[in-house]
Amino acid sequence: MKIKITAAILLSMLFTVSCTDLDEQLYDQVEDGNFGNTTKEIDALVGGAYSSLRGFSDAISNNFPTCEYVFFLNEVVSDEATIPTRGTNWYDGGQYQDAQKHTWKSDNRMILSAWRYNYTGIAKINAIIYQIDKSSLSDKSKEPIYAELKALRAYYYYNLLDLFGNVPIVTDFEDTALPTNSTRKEVYDFVEKELTDAIPHLNPNAVYSKMTRNVAYSILARLYLNSEAFIGQQRWQDCINMCQKVTGYSLTPDFFSNFVTENQTSTEIIFAIPYDSKAGTVGNYMNSMSCHYNQKLAISAIPNNYPWSANGMCAQPGVYSAFADTDKRKKCMLEGDQINLATGTVIMMDNGEPLTYTENLTSLEDAKENEGVRLHKYEMKAGEQWERDHDFVLIRYAEILMMQAECYVRLGSPDLARPFVQQVASRAGEELPATIDLAFINQELLKEFTFEGRRRTDNIRFGTFFEPWWSKGTTEKYRAIFPIPSTVLTTNKNLKQNPGYPN
């Protein structure tokens, strides 16, 4: 039997889960009872839950996958990255300037895209759980399946907790009532309980790109690390305890092996979004969004054998110079003359000027084409196109080490922090100072995780988010979370706007 979702129910789902363009193939019909009764069918269902991690292209997110906007949003409101307007390019209604200046409003498309991305993933998981409920599998067989799905759903809710705070908790596929806000504390408690309840039933082994115990421990560690920022409660020791439960991973000897095209063999990656252009999945666009249009000439001497690039995101002034020249991680950015592989000369831009990346920018509102140091963390090579095969890294073992180091410093035990941060810094060729303090930890986080879509959260935790920097003044405290998108509020009158933002 198939349950056909009526137009009214589908419309309800659209605003219940934040107005997302649900994939018609996935959501116009839900099998009831006749599907999900074999291992192969269950694997297909659970595999479908992970596909939403890649995001989807739509008009709201300018035809770039929505997952990219989640990471852009966390970067361009931080002290790390910016998307300056260059002539008439990258203005897009001022959404990037507003993000950098911390003057965003509830109609910002990046904010809407981040909301929709997470709730689309949640909606799909709710539908799959509903389908498994109706299957003929035994309750015991269903336990690990439910655990995996609910832990993955908790990952999306963690993102919403971090970004928006007071969001609706939607878990019942059949419930078409318009939801109300949950408090940030309620969302926090929900994420913690979902992960804690799931852990005993999750796979204890390291399984690439799947929701395992190690991934759940890592998300809980993040939750406890940011607990003070989220709910005003310090849980540093709980963060350490979760980190110590993560096993089976190690730092790769070469930092950049985590970002090569075939990075799925890394011993360091705990959780990632898998991409495969041959399979037709949306690729990792991070480098492409950053490099100049003519960067292609530095990648391949053969015409039409290089990836396209958009000349968008770049590092803010001061980020590149924060790295010592001996720091191996500094190569994650491109600075200076870009050389044409075919001619051996400096690449020229279309305006006749040399493509020489500079750290400084004239302004956020009118930057030159070559201004801003560019992202080069993920491998770029000839033969690739816009969509790439690099799996997007979400959690690395380096983060597990750095969380422990930070928490020990915050607990007043910097000597206990040293061996953890030592592993990370030594790989980069960096020596530690005599005393490990929070200022050093903050800088080390900047350098280790540059352009990995997490800097905003660090800024908030260290308090720097609210201080003036390159292109912004002092930030109001309420902007630690984003507004609920205006289109969501229009569609669901039961929702209230986050404090500080106009309705």
Residue spans for each PLM region:
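Short coil/turn linking the two alpha-helices of tandem helical-hairpin repeats
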Residues: 159-163, 168, 206, 226-233, ...
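Conserved, well-structured interaction surfaces
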Residues: 39, 43-47, 51-57, 85-163, ...
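Long, intrinsically disordered, low-complexity segments
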Residues: 18-21, 88, 115-121, 184, ...
